[in-house]
């Protein structure tokens, strides 16, 4: 005979949700930081190909 599972508490549900939201917020913060550093030209971990036209303009 089918028996329903025990209900998990709201506290556990909220804790799992908070952990998930925290990880998402951290990933979003890293993405924003990386985007800002790329836009300002301060990114050290990227190598950009330089076109010949850009070299002649400078």
UniProtKB/Swiss-Prot annotation:
Domain of life (superkingdom): Bacteria
InterPro entries attached to this UniProt entry: Ribosomal_bL32, Ribosomal_bL32_plant/cyanobact, Ribosomal_zn-bd
Pfam families xref list: Ribosomal_L32p (PF01783)
One annotated GO molecular function: structural constituent of ribosome
SUPFAM superfamilies reported for this sequence: Zn-binding ribosomal proteins (SSF57829)
GO biological process, one term: translation
Keywords, ordered alphabetically: Ribonucleoprotein, Ribosomal protein
GO cellular component, one term: large ribosomal subunit
Family named by the database record: Belongs to the bacterial ribosomal protein bL32 family.
Record's protein name: Large ribosomal subunit protein bL32
């Amino acid at each position: 005979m089918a028996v329903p599972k025990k209900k998990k508490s709201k506290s556990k549900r909220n804790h799992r949700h908070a952990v998930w939201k925290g990880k998402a917020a951290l990933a979003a913060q890293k993405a924003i930081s990386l985007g800002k550093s790329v836009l300002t030209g301060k990114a050290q971990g990227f190598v950009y190909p330089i076109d010949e036209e850009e070299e002649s303009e400078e």
